[in-house]
Amino acid sequence: MPTHHQIVVNGVRLHYVEVGNPQGPLAVLLHGFPEFWRAWERQIEPLARAGFRVVVPDLRGYNLSEKPPGVSAYRVGTLQEDVAALIRALGQGRAHVVGHDWGGIVAWALAIRQPEVVDRLVILNAPHPARARQVARKPAQWRRSWYIFFFQLPWLPERFLHRFGAWALHGTNPQAYTDEDRRLYREAWDQPGAATAMINYYRALRRSRRARRESASGAQVRVPTLVIWGQRDVALLPELADGLDRWVPDLRVVRLPRASHWVMRDEPVRVNNLLVEFLSGALVEASVPT
């Protein structure tokens, strides 16, 4: 069973759960929007059984972690520093980093800016910043990204999250999210200040000059990387997973044609096998057929 902890890193108090061999290789799993640590509940035990020390934080602003005020507290650079500081505070110089959605955006940033703390990188349905800039010009992606523009409004997105957030949690697998899952998610969203903090990620992204410079410069990733992409993502075009070897030389891409954005929920067994194989160094193919 996971144990729950609180730790202060980079000036913010983070809640995290931990399970597995304390002496094993550290694997840090980063959730996305609008989730929290339980996003990875079907991956935690399989990774622990494979010998990893598994640590899963609530990102700043989420669930039981601290919720600093102001949009600037949620810039990608700050989020990336949180994770780097967490890895160091856990007594490790490096860790495997796995990120989905916003957790993937943070994981990309960490691998780009602080590769010395990343051993292996796994990204699930989160765009590399340079590829995102290319695809963002396409009207088809604009239509899918409507919520990013909506989230720039004051107070209204928070109301939307409280009333309709659970609507988004539907994968292609009917068992992706249970009624109990949705109850726990609503409980996390109802933590004081959580809704505004979560939506501030999007507000900060739109205002981040550094993120725009980085996406324009084609930031390189120099660590072994696995990208797992659910092809039935309604928010992100499948082509966001194309052409990544331009920026990521040591790359493997696995496309799951039946999975949605919630890929680790739709196909947990497949994802778990890929994670264990890749993080153990056993997945060597340049691209794994679907």
Task: Go through each PLM region and give its residues.
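Flexible "cap/lid" subdomain of the alpha/beta-hydrolase fold that forms the substrate-access gate
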Residues: 2-5, 12-14, 19, 26, ...
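Conserved HGGG/HGGXW glycine-rich cap/lid loop of the alpha/beta-hydrolase fold
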Residues: 18-66
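Short phosphate-engaging motifs
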Residues: 36, 194, 271
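A short, glycine- and basic residue-enriched loop/turn
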Residues: 36-37, 105, 259-260
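Catalytic histidine-centered segment of alpha/beta-hydrolase-like enzymes
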Residues: 259-268, 272
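Alpha/beta-hydrolase-fold serine-hydrolase catalytic core, especially in secreted/extracellular enzymes
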Residues: 282-290
